[in-house]
Amino acid sequence: MESMSKIEAVLFDLDGTLLDSFPDFLASLENINVKSSSKKIDESVVRANVSDGSSKLLKLVFDIDTDDKAFDEHKRNFLNEYERNILMYGNLFLGVSDLLNFLLDKKIPYGIVTNKPRKYTEIILKKSSLLRQSKVVICCDDGFKSKPNPEGINHACNILGVPNSKCIYVGDHENDLNASLAAGTISGVCTFGYGFKKR
């Protein structure tokens, strides 16, 4: 790991890295499950796929394909529930507040590059004062290719005015690691998140 004296910025993934959003996702899935099915939800499946997007999550939890007639309704209902549940049950992971406060104290700018849509990310920012102090936030629908493509990380570094080689990117998914490597940033792997399966 580079010494902190060489680090000019830190960028983070959101779900599974800064934010434990699993409880919000689980509550949302359980709410639509009550309305549409009696199938018991496997929490381990939800936790293991939180970082893979809502479509994959719905396919696995409800055993439904994206071309199924009911899929669009399931997804719409889930996203409506999730919007209501954002940070109702989830929170920053243990230690994240201390880390972000440390970066603020050291005047090291931090930001977020996430595959989460802007609509939901903005709700999270409004509810978290520490995340709201991010100097840059790049979302999947901001016009850049999603991770593992490095476009979002590259743009974030440009906004911060920091060379990629002087920036750390931290994530919990292989897409995060691959995006970081492609961007030429220093890579940080968050093993307590959802994306990296136990090997």
Regions found by a protein language model. Name each.
Residues 41-45, 69-70, 132-136, 164-168:
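Short acidic capping loops at alpha-helix termini that bridge into adjacent secondary structure
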Residues 5-14, 18-98, 102, 106, ...:
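N-terminal helical cap/lid subdomain that shapes the substrate entry/recognition surface
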Residues 39, 109, 186:
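Residue-level detector of anion-binding/catalytic polar loops
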Residues 34-36, 57-65, 89, 97, ...:
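Substrate-recognition/cap helix-loop segment adjacent to the acidic, metal-dependent catalytic center
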Residues 11-13, 113, 170:
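Generic enzyme active-site microenvironment
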